[in-house]
Swiss-Prot record:
<dbReference type="GO" id="GO:0005669">
    <property type="term" value="C:transcription factor TFIID complex"/>
</dbReference>
<feature type="compositionally biased region" description="Low complexity">
    <location>
        <begin position="206"/>
        <end position="226"/>
    </location>
</feature>
<dbReference type="InterPro" id="IPR007900">
    <property type="entry name" value="TAF4_C"/>
</dbReference>
<keyword id="KW-0805">Transcription regulation</keyword>
<feature type="compositionally biased region" description="Polar residues">
    <location>
        <begin position="246"/>
        <end position="255"/>
    </location>
</feature>
<keyword id="KW-0175">Coiled coil</keyword>
<feature type="region of interest" description="Disordered">
    <location>
        <begin position="1"/>
        <end position="29"/>
    </location>
</feature>
<comment type="function">
    <text>Functions as a component of the DNA-binding general transcription factor complex TFIID. Binding of TFIID to a promoter (with or without TATA element) is the initial step in pre-initiation complex (PIC) formation. TFIID plays a key role in the regulation of gene expression by RNA polymerase II through different activities such as transcription activator interaction, core promoter recognition and selectivity, TFIIA and TFIIB interaction, chromatin modification (histone acetylation by TAF1), facilitation of DNA opening and initiation of transcription.</text>
</comment>
<feature type="coiled-coil region">
    <location>
        <begin position="380"/>
        <end position="412"/>
    </location>
</feature>
<feature type="compositionally biased region" description="Polar residues">
    <location>
        <begin position="165"/>
        <end position="187"/>
    </location>
</feature>
<feature type="region of interest" description="Disordered">
    <location>
        <begin position="287"/>
        <end position="307"/>
    </location>
</feature>
<comment type="similarity">
    <text>Belongs to the TAF4 family.</text>
</comment>
<feature type="compositionally biased region" description="Polar residues">
    <location>
        <begin position="227"/>
        <end position="239"/>
    </location>
</feature>
<feature type="domain" description="Histone-fold">
    <location>
        <begin position="316"/>
        <end position="396"/>
    </location>
</feature>
<feature type="region of interest" description="Disordered">
    <location>
        <begin position="165"/>
        <end position="262"/>
    </location>
</feature>
<dbReference type="Pfam" id="PF05236">
    <property type="entry name" value="TAF4"/>
</dbReference>
<dbReference type="GO" id="GO:0006352">
    <property type="term" value="P:DNA-templated transcription initiation"/>
</dbReference>
Length: 550
């Protein structure tokens, strides 16, 4: 308490007589003045629980009510014990002393404030840590108890809570004037700090008639909290708290928006529009706008990049080489579309040539059609015996040549020009390469060649019979007219003659190779396919036929 606010007891009585609405004890009165009040006529029961239910029962027999007395508790949780008033020393001159002592246990109700025998019972719930107090009307009387003590200065100016806010407050804490600047979740605020203290946005708005810390209805006799609640229906916000009117406006705007959206949905449903399908279509169109995204025709399948047939680097080098001969200088690597076009054209042309070569290969390998007969060979055997027409024609030619050769050799044997294969073994022994006669003849031939230096043919040294027969044949032909066969054929040594061709050729004289058809395209088929093309194929055809082997 500051010393500059001390007043005398007479000033306090005058203020009580003039303005019963507000009593402010800046300095406690003297003990003699306090004895004028009868504390036995004051029954103040303030039962405040954690659920913010305010029950105030005040029996007022006098016509004047003075200010509410409340106790603010800022610490959480704190239990208080009631102590008896202690004698006051004359130096302090403060007869009103409230001793607060912290109770470590959480339990039943405690008497927090005592005014010389008249106690204000404050009930503290064991489950909660918040304490709320309600105002109680104290009726000043005369000449009874001398131990009545008014409340301390720090707890005098407390707003009374209206019924509207008291029933809805849940986690509230009364805040004293000293701690008004630091309190956050506060509901009632003292009048001394109403102009300066900044409350939090969560603070509940106080009633409009409580700006002076007392209800306007306390002037009349028998006023209760119910009358205060009825008269203080209009509310205003304290500090930075938002007014309730703004919240009501926001709620109304939200309801209006909900009604508009519901009407819009009803209109869309009545028109037969499927919102889900429209959203899917819009999303698909957005995906199609992105580069590389699949189109609608592909049904979401990923587009595959085609690899060109010809390598762009080698193709551009070849084009640059050809264009350089025509005095055209161009970098074909920069024009990728041109390279792709040429590559696609080459691929189409090569596919055309390959198709023609395949058709020619099938015609070349096509065999003679066989008709199946009853009791004949199985179809598998007949298919294995199928040959091409060219192969069959070659076989027929070989057989005819063999027959002609056999007839010719047979005629030579009849004429005695060749030795028959059915003669005795002596002739075979004489003509044996390892016999003495053969070696002797070979030695004579070698000596003759060394001496004369000329080769002596066999018809010159085959015997005098052969040569003499020819000469005698001429003489005899002139004189006697002997036939040719006597000296020439009969007189000659026909046993020494042997057909070397038949011995080398074997039985038939020609080796036959059966050409089976194969599922492949050969060089001849490609050359035949290129012959149908007119431009740019002559040089390739010439090289192809040069490499073709029979």
């Amino acid at each position: 308490m500051s010393e500059d606010l001390k007043r005398s007891a007479s000033d306090i009585q005058d203020e009580l007589a003039q303005s019963p609405k507000r009593v402010k004890f800046n300095d406690p009165p003297q003990i003699d003045d306090v004895n004028k009040y009868d504390a036995n006529n004051v029954n103040a029961n303030a039962n405040v629980n954690a659920n913010a239910n305010v029950n105030a029962n005040a029996n007022d027999s006098n016509s004047n009510n003075f200010a509410s007395i409340a106790s603010n508790v800022t610490t959480n949780p704190i239990d208080f014990t009631v102590t008896q008033p202690q004698p006051v020393s004359p130096e302090i001159q403060n007869p009103i002393t409230t001793l607060l002592q912290t109770d470590p246990g959480v339990g039943a109700s405690k008497d927090l404030l005592t005014t010389n025998g008249s106690a204000i019972n404050i009930t503290k719930n064991a489950d909660t840590n918040n304490i709320e107090t309600n105002t109680a009307s104290i009726n000043p009387v005369s000449n009874t108890n001398t131990n009545t003590k008014p409340a301390s200065v720090d707890t005098v100016d407390i707003k009374s809570v209206s019924a509207n806010t008291a029933d809805t407050a849940t986690d509230t804490k009364p805040v004293s004037a000293d701690n008004a600047d630091t309190a956050t979740d506060t509901k009632p605020v003292s009048a001394d700090t109403a102009d300066t203290a900044d409350t939090d946005a969560d603070a509940k708005p106080a009633s409009a008639n409580t700006s002076n810390t007392t209800n306007a209805n306390t002037a009349g006799t028998g006023a209760s909290n119910t009358d205060v609640a009825n008269s203080s229906s209009a509310t205003t916000s304290t500090g930075d708290a938002k007014p309730q009117v703004q919240g009501a406006n926001e709620t109304g705007s939200n309801q209006h928006d909900q009604r508009d959206s519901s009407k819009l949905n009803d209109a869309i449903a009545a028109a037969g529009v499927d919102i889900q399908k429209e959203e899917e279509l819009l999303q698909q169109r957005q995906l199609n706008r992105k580069p590389g995204a699949p189109s609608e025709k592909q049904d979401g399948s990923k587009s595959q990049t085609q690899v060109p047939l010809l390598n762009p680097y080698h193709l551009s080098a070849f084009l640059a080489k050809v264009s350089k001969t025509h005095q055209i200088h161009q970098n074909f690597l920069e024009d990728g579309n041109l390279l792709n076009l040429i590559s696609d054209a080459c691929e189409d042309w090569l596919s055309h040539i390959a198709s023609k070569a395949l058709i020619l290969s099938r015609h070349r390998r096509r065999g003679t059609q066989f008709s199946l007969k009853k009791g004949g060979l199985s179809s598998l055997t007949q298919l294995s015996q199928q040959r091409s027409a060219v192969s069959k024609e070659l076989r027929n030619l070989a057989l005819r040549q063999k027959e002609m050769e056999e007839k010719r050799v047979q005629k030579r044997i009849v004429l005695g020009l060749e030795k028959s294969s059915g003669n005795g073994t002596d002739d075979a022994a004489n003509g044996k390469p390892g016999s003495e006669e053969t070696l002797h003849r070979a030695a004579n031939a070698t000596a003759a060649m060394m001496a004369t230096g000329k080769k002596k043919y066999s018809w010159m040294s085959s015997g005098g019979g052969g040569a003499g027969s020819i000469g005698s044949l001429g003489d005899d032909a002139r004189g006697s007219g002997v036939g040719i066969g006597g000296g020439g054929v009969g007189g000659g040594d026909s046993k020494t003659k042997q057909s070397a061709i038949l011995s080398a050729r074997g039985d038939n004289g020609l080796r036959y190779r059966d050409l089976r058809s194969t599922n492949a395209i050969v060089l001849k088929d490609l050359l035949n396919a290129l012959e149908g093309e007119k431009k740019g194929t002559q040089h390739a055809i010439t090289k192809g036929y040069a490499k073709l082997r029979d």
